[in-house]
Amino acid sequence: MMERREFLGHMARATVAGGAVLAVGRRAWPLAETPAGNARRASVVDFGADPTGQKDATAAVQRAIATLGKRNARLVFPAGKYSFAASDAVLMDFRGYEGLEIFGNGAELSFAGATQPLRLTDCKDLEIHDITVEWTRPPFSQGIIRAAGARGVTVAVDAAYPVDGTERVQALLGFESHGKGPLASGVTVYNVGAVQLKGSQVLEIALAERASFKVGDSIVLLHPASDTAALRLEGCEQILLETVSFHTAPGAAVVLSGCGDITLNTVRVIPHPGSGRLISSCGDGVEILDCTGTASVQHALIQGSAGAGMRVQQAYWRVSQVADPQSALLASTDGKPVPEWLLPPQGTYMQISEAATLKLLGEIAVSKAEAVPGGMRLSFSETLSPAIGKGTLFCLSATNQLQLKMDDCKFRGGPYIGLVAQSRARIGNSSFSGYAGPAILLAPDLEHMRGPVVENVHITDCSFSDCNLARRTLTPGEERGAITIDTKPEPQVEQEAAAIPNRINEGITLQRNVFSQLGAPAIYCAGASWLDVESNRFGDCDRLRPAGAEPRAIVLRNLDESTITGNEASAAAKVVMIDCTDKVKVGDNGPLTNATS
């Protein structure tokens, strides 16, 4: 049975440790082999691009790019609409540029099929301004469920999404009516069987697993045959994306892999206004993976991504062999050599963790890194401890990891999670609403080799509403909060009580946040020390609790050295402590009461 994690892992696999799936083995446009010119500026209309969108602009845009020099060049799209024919190639491919600027002047770039619109590799000091990315035919369809059974559904597909029964359906995402519009129900199926046309715009879809879709609910059918990102940056530095919008993409809207010093200003991943679409990108909204320096994210608007709204993570690398006392071979998740932009530079510190528990074993500086078949070889000036062997995990140390600074951002819902992050994150003055799962998830993910453990995270002055409304009942040990801090990304679903999580997370501050209308507790934290929850406000939490049960505002499992104080609630609710030490101090929290188990 394919689960959500497996499907989303497939959609994002190219961007984690092995990063080069889309960069390797794909037919490229002739531009990739064309030497750069020496022009400082090129307007695509001067090379024949049609700003009315009536003609294919591919050749004209590539002619314009071919004239540009590698330093301080500017590519200009005059205002208008530019259409691009379907292809399995990278349409605009830049490598080794410095000072590149791409100005859109509000232009809409409309793509088709599996085309990858824009890829930049090993570029420095680059800017992209004022462009909107769209697909002529979205890589999904949506409609209304007319019949539903345990092993199949009949869907009346909206006329805006023409279907003939030959479309491949990779996943089904359920939505139910809620107030002003549909919200993700949390009913999602990734194991889809045969599809048959049963009349004009009516599809009968077999399911390989049981699902609880309801007649009358809205549903989205994901079709993408690839995990193509609309914008992909690999190994780039000093990046500015400003007023760039993405209405859909077959995979993530934006992927930044192995990049440094990123500024995202007014980036939007949203359904096309007025389209009535329930989702935007078919993968994550924005992925910031294995990056360094600072990522400053301001005024972003994220809505409707099928995966996480934003994902900020580092890769775990598993030792496949200790070659000698001062070198180790590390395996990539895709079995390929690690691309150059992901090799840690000389002097980079790596943290070393025990695979079974994620317990930190120490840190070591890299003296040399080189790609080898199946991964990379790291060499060190120091001698490795005998405790380090096959299976041990390496990850960038905290001093080398990216620092996320997020301010004034809006996450407006989707069928999964708003923000996934791990460490060195400051999230302020932002709002999260309408997610089937948590608004913010902080947890390492060994299944997909993403980390590190949670450390040095501050979430302040944010609002959370209408989250964790998925149709499911969680037993003790499986809770998720609007903010969830855990030792694993998914709850442990077992017949017996969940195992006590290892205490590996630390240094989390949650202050002056407002929580309301939540299906689950506002905060769930497991396996942590030094959690500070102060001056938050809670209202109408835990709405999906069992009948007769008292609502839970906060659930804490196996915590130490933590403080929960000065919080307020509009109604009685509980602070639940499970397997916590006596160094967890809870008090002065208005009508919130303490419960220990």
What spans do the regions from the language model cover?
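Right-handed parallel beta-helix/beta-solenoid
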Residues: 29-60
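Short glycine/acidic-rich loop motifs that flank beta-strands on beta-rich extracellular proteins
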Residues: 86-89, 111-117, 137-141, 228-230, ...
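Ser/Thr/Gly-rich low-complexity blocks that favor extended beta-strand/coil architectures
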Residues: 111, 135-137, 142, 158-198, ...
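N-terminal extracellular ligand-recognition/capping segment immediately after the signal peptide
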Residues: 45-49, 58-66, 70-100, 104-119, ...
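Small/polar beta-strand repeat architecture
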Residues: 181-228, 360-363, 368-404, 408, ...
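The right-handed parallel beta-helix/beta-solenoid scaffold, focusing on the short coil/turn
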Residues: 73, 80, 90, 98-100, ...
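N-terminal secretory signal peptides and thylakoid transit peptides that target proteins
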Residues: 1-18
